[in-house]
Curated annotation (Swiss-Prot):
A Pfam family hit: SecY
Protein name: Protein translocase subunit SecY
Membrane-spanning ranges: 18-38, 78-98, 124-144, 157-177, 180-200, 215-235, 272-292, 318-338, 382-402, 403-423
Xref: Gene3D superfamilies: SecY subunit domain (1.10.3370.10)
GO MF term (any one): protein transmembrane transporter activity
Organism: Mycobacterium tuberculosis (strain ATCC 25618 / H37Rv)
Subcellular location: Cell membrane
Additional facts recorded: Was identified as a high-confidence drug target.
Keyword line: Cell membrane, Membrane, Protein transport, Translocation, Transmembrane, Transmembrane helix, Transport
PANTHER family, per the entry: SECY/SEC61-ALPHA FAMILY MEMBER
Any one cellular-component term (Gene Ontology): plasma membrane
Function summary: The central subunit of the protein translocation channel SecYEG. Consists of two halves formed by TMs 1-5 and 6-10. These two domains form a lateral gate at the front which open onto the bilayer between TMs 2 and 7, and are clamped together by SecE at the back. The channel is closed by both a pore ring composed of hydrophobic SecY resides and a short helix (helix 2A) on the extracellular side of the membrane which forms a plug. The plug probably moves laterally to allow the channel to open. The ring and the pore may move independently.
GO biological process: protein transport by the Sec complex; SRP-dependent cotranslational protein targeting to membrane, translocation
């Protein structure tokens, strides 16, 4: 491990990528700690302490999960990666509905660039909407309930517009930084920024668990997190290897092919994307309800307000757990269906003279791949759902339903381990290309 790390730093190109990624991460954390103009930061800090200790503490922890604590502090990067994630969900859903998007997806790199451009435009529009909602909630006292202090001292139109523009610009900058990491650094940029935001909150949340619940609960939570980490690493490395044989063929005077290889199908083919999508989607009803309440100035008594307040504001509630679990299952199947097309894989294999032993090329191969993929996706989706909701159940039973520290939850652990493994594998492939021994044995 140490020798591989030293080798990665000795390689000029790889060292440049690692240092570039670290530089972007540092800038991201600086922006996440920099208050927006017009925000009374000491009052914000005091309100966060009061709100986190109240009944809404759990949903506040969930909201802060993807921003590293920046959202509730109303910093420059308060909106963070959420607009881009939401835009990605919408664009990928539209590929099933709009034929033009489906055609772009099949056009390769050029089509993907166009889809990315549409995602950026939609992300900026969503950033404006989300920043406006956050500022409106903060101005009306609905963002941090139970706090009477003024978060925004000067509530003139000019000040509010400036804060919205700053947060929107921050979201655009975060999106650009994530794409820079993907293009010039190591790992997936957006996923890595989410990873950094979660990791930044672990020390403070660990101290909070230790002080509020004592050493026994803290040890139990750490042990549960360790067990989850081991299980996640084990499953993430698991794959079904489908043997592929390539027939010999003559090209000029040379013989090509005749080799045997395999097509790896991971148990968790979708990665952490379904968890990120489900986590970002499940808090939207709460945010919309808070915005409506702050706009009307009264607490709603409709069935929707009661449903959101009772079930969707408490991550340890059984209804919340069931909806969250169902969303993960849905997004797992949906994302796998988009990223892995059995028909395209079968056509590619047939084009280059490849076939699965015992299976005819073409349609039978596609049907076989679809059958195997469906059998793998079911346990993979259940695995993601169970790991994500297991700490919710554990803390509900063991801690009497008190506030959940989400950086130690299954969602955060899944994202951190998934992103960490993906980043290590990218460094591993870079080292192996240069004939160095990698991290993974």
């Amino acid at each position: 491990m140490l020798s591989a790390f030293i080798s990665s730093l000795r390689t000029v190109d790889l060292r440049r990528k690692i240092l570039f990624t670290l530089g972007i991460v540092i800038l991201y954390r600086v922006g996440a700690a920099l208050p927006s103009p017009g925000v009374n930061f000491p009052n914000v800090q005091q309100c966060i302490k009061e709100a986190s200790a109240g009944e809404a503490g759990q949903i506040y922890s969930l909201i802060n999960l993807f921003s590293g604590g920046a959202l509730l502090k109303l910093t420059v990067f308060a909106v963070g990666v959420m607009p881009y994630i939401t835009a990605s969900i919408i664009v990928q859903l539209l590929t099933v509905v709009i034929p033009r998007f489906e055609e772009l997806r099949k056009e390769g790199q050029a089509g993907q660039s166009k889809m990315t451009q549409y995602t950026r435009y939609l992300a900026i529009a969503l950033a404006i909407l989300q920043a406006t909602s956050i500022v409106a909630l903060a101005a009306n006292g609905g963002l941090l309930q139970g706090c009477s202090l003024d978060i925004i001292a000067d509530q003139s139109i000019f000040t509010l517009v400036v804060i919205v523009l700053v947060m929107t610009g921050g979201a655009a900058l975060v999106m650009w930084m994530g794409e820079l990491i993907t293009e010039r650094g190591i790992g997936n940029g957006m996923s890595l920024l989410i990873f950094v935001g979660i990791a930044a909150r672990i020390p403070a949340e660990g101290q909070s668990i230790l002080e509020s619940r004592g050493g026994v609960v803290f040890t139990a939570v750490c042990a549960a997190a360790l067990i989850i980490i081991v299980g996640v690493v084990f499953v993430e490395q698991g794959q079904r290897r489908i043997p592929v044989q390539y027939a010999k063929r003559m090209v000029g005077r040379r013989m090509y092919g005749g080799t045997s290889t395999y097509l790896p199908l991971k148990v968790n083919q979708a990665g952490v994307i379904p968890v990120i999508f489900a986590s970002s989607l499940i808090y939207i009803p709460h945010l919309i309800t808070q915005l409506i309440r702050s706009g009307s100035g009264v607490v709603g008594n409709s069935w929707w307000d009661k449903f959101v307040g009772t079930y969707l504001s408490d991550p340890s509630n059984l209804v919340y757990i069931g909806i969250y679990f169902g969303l993960i299952i849905f997004f797992t199947y949906f994302y796998v269906s988009i990223t892995f097309n059995p028909d395209e894989r079968a056509d590619e294999m047939k084009k280059f003279g490849g076939f699965i032993p015992g299976i005819r090329p073409g349609r039978p191969t596609a049907d076989y791949l679809r059958y195997v993929l469906s059998r793998i996706t079911l346990p993979g989706s259940i695995y993601l759902g169970v790991i994500a909701v297991l700490p919710n159940l554990f803390l509900q039973i063991g801690a009497g339903g008190t506030v959940q520290n989400l950086p130690f939850g299954g969602t955060a652990v899944l994202i951190m381990i998934g992103v960490g493994l993906d980043t290590v594998k990218q460094i591993e492939s870079q080292l192996m290309q240069r004939n160095y021994e990698g991290f993974l044995k």
